[in-house]
Amino acid sequence: MPKPSAAARARKIKLIIFDVDGVLTDGKIWIFPAPGGSGAQQSVLEKSAQRGGQGGFGLNSTSLIEAKGFHAHDGTAISLARLAGIKTGIITKRVSETVALRARDLKIDHVYQGIQDKASVFAQILEKDGITAAEAAFVGDDVIDLPAMRKCGLAIAVKNARPEVKAEAHWATSHAGGDGAARDAVEYILKAQGKWKKAVEEYIGERS
């Protein structure tokens, strides 16, 4: 039996999970010293540790501030996915208050930071939402994303993903990570489901 096409896979999607560094950002990480430490960063680290995650900075993480840049088009796409009834999530190896703030602003459903084993957390999210692996997409860029991508219904690689990731992806974006890749992924899925135009009109209506 032939394997389902990427479009056929996209029609089943109810959840989209994104990596952060290299997917929602261009992969660059800006780190600055924070005199006296950052209470907000400590809060994120403590919450992540409670879920089994580990901080990305080591023991002195609270004395650092991590900054990242996000593309506005990707933010709009995540809002469009929500309007279309598709849940979103992020699973990332690093821990950053910047990511927590961006996720809160975009009303992302699932936020997991400091995660080494992305496949296990991916499985937990599926169980929590009551959906199957075939109904979930994962957007990644590097080899740490492969275990989760191998378990999802639609594995998406960003344009500048590592060759190993592209080789196993069902579909690749036309834009690089941090430069509209998430927008490509959401648009592809919503158009496959015939939900794109309605979501766009609802988005415009919310802001009229």
Regions found by a protein language model. Name each.
Residues 94-95, 103, 116-117, 160, ...:
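Short beta->alpha linker loops
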Residues 35, 64, 71, 110, ...:
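Mg2+-dependent phosphoryl-transfer enzymes with acidic/Ser/Thr/Gly-rich catalytic loops
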Residues 1-84:
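Active-site neighborhood of HAD-like aspartate-dependent phosphohydrolases
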Residues 4-7, 102, 130, 163:
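A general structural signal for stabilizing positions within well-ordered secondary structure
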Residues 19-21, 27, 94, 141, ...:
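Fold-independent oxyanion-binding glycine-rich loops
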Residues 76-102, 112-113, 149:
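Substrate-recognition element of Asp-dependent hydrolases with the DxDx(T/V) motif
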Residues 17, 85, 107, 130:
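Conserved functional loop/turn residues at catalytic and ligand-binding sites
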